C-alpha cells in the first residue's frame, strides 16, 4: 500500500512537471508569434520610410554641383578646389549655372516659372540660396619673436572663443556685418572644427545676372580674408514627381595652414509624409508600433515586479530594456519631428524671397532614421532568444554565451597590442601618410591591414626602415597569433558545448517538436496529410507484421531475425529507460554524473579486454 501511495505521488508530480513544460512551451510559442508580428510591422515601418528615389536624387544633385567644371578648366569643380582663386571660379561658374535654369536646352524660355528656378526642369529651388562665412580674429595665436619683423598678424584655428564678431570691409549689408543665429539648426561638424550658426551672410538673388555681379563685387572687395575659416553654401530643392525635398550644403574650410578643404551634405528627405494611400498604411503601422510598445512595456513591468533583482541577471532582459528604451526614443523623435514640420513647413514655403532653412528639419529626419535603424538592428538580435528550439542554433548561441569571459580577456590583450601599433603608426607615419594622419585614421588603417586592403608602398616610402618592420610584425602578432587564438577559443568552447548536448536531451528542443507537431496537425486538419491514427489502423487491418512481410516477399530467416530483434528491444526497454520514449526526466546531479562517467570508463576497459581475448581466440582458430 505504501508502495502504491509512493507510486501515485511520483506519477502526480511527474504529470505536473509535464503540464508545466507544456505551459512553458505554449507561452514561448505565443511570445514568438507576437514578436514576429511586431518585427514584421517594424520592418514595414522602417523600409517604408526609405525611397529608392532618394539615392538617385542625391546622385543627380551631387553630380551637378560637385563634378561640373568650367570647360577647359579642370580645377573649377567643387571637389578640386584648392585655393581662393579656384573657389571664386566655382562660385561664378558651375554654382551659378547649376542654380539658375531659366530656359530649355534649345534656349526657349521655361513656362510657368513663377520666379523660381527649376533645376533639371524637375526640381524647384525653394526660396533663395545663402552663402555664410565664419572668421577668426587677428592675434588669436602668437608669433615667435624672431619672426615678428616678418609677420605681425596671426590667425589661429577656429573656435567659438577665437571667432571674429566685428564688422569688416565695406561694413554695409549683412555680408559685411556679423549676424547672430535665429535658427535652431545644429552646429556643423567639419574636418577642422565644430562651427556654430551665424556669421557674415550673403543671400543670393532670384536673378542670375544680379547674383553674378554680386559675386564679382565680393571678390573685388576681398570678402574672403586671412581670417576666413569656413564658408557654407546652403539651398533646398523640391521634386513633386517623387515628393522629396533635397537639402544641400556645400562646405569650404580654410585651415590655418592655407589651402581649402571641401566637404558636402546632400539630404533627400520626405517632409510631406502622408499624401498617398501607402503613406497612410505606414501611419497605421506607426500606430500599431505604439500599441506593441505599450504591451511589451506592461509585460516587462510585470516581470520586474515578480522577479525583482533576479530579473536583471539575464542578458536577454537587459536587451529587452534596451530595445524598449530605443523604441521610446524613436517615438519621441518622430513626434517632435512631425510637430516641427507642422509648425515650420508652411512658413518656410511662403518665404520665396528669403532663404528657407530646411536644414533643421532635415537633421531631425536623419536623427529619426538613425535611431529607428539602431532599433531594428537590436530587434533582429533579439531573435536569438527564440531560436533555442533548434539544436544547431542553440549550440551556437550557447557557445557564444559560454565563451564571453574568455573573449573579454582576449579582447583586453588584443586591444593593448592593437592600440600600441596604432600609436606607433600615427607617430611614425602621421605627417606623411593620409591613412595615419590622425590616431582615429591609424586605427581604421590597421583594420584594413587585417582585411588585406592596405597601401604598403606609402608607409615604406615614408620610412624605409620602420615601415616594413611595422607591417611585418603587425601581421605576425595580430593576424597569425591573436586571430588564431580567438578562433581557438571559439572552437574549444564549441567542442565543450557539443559534448554537453550529446549527454542528454534539453527542454528547449521540446519546442521544436511541438512546432513540428502543430504543423502536422494543421496539415491533417486541412486534409493535406493523412492522420497518423488512420495509418495505424490501416497497418493493423492488413494483419500481423509477419504476414505483411511474407506478402511483400521477405524470406522466413529475415522475418525470424526481425522478430527476435524486436523481442530483445522490448526486453531492454523494460529493463532500462530509453531517452527516445521518455516523456520526462529527472535532472542528474554532479555526483551521479561522475559515477556514471566512471562506470562508463570501466565498461570501456572491460570491452577492450574482451576484444583482446576475442582477437586471440580468432587467431588461434585461424591457425588450426
From Swiss-Prot:
Domain of life from the UniProt record: Eukaryota
Swiss-Prot/TrEMBL GO biological process terms: detection of mechanical stimulus
Major subcellular site: membrane
One cellular component (GO) term of this entry: membrane
Keywords for this protein: Coiled coil, Glycoprotein, Ion channel, Ion transport, Membrane, Transmembrane, Transmembrane helix, Transport
Keyword Metal-binding: no
Glycan attachment sites: 115, 138
Any one Pfam family match given in the protein's UniProt record, by short name: PKD_channel
Keyword Cell membrane among record annotations: no
MF GO annotations: calcium channel activity; calcium ion binding
Protein name, UniProt field: Polycystin-2-like protein 2
The gene coding this protein: PKD2L2
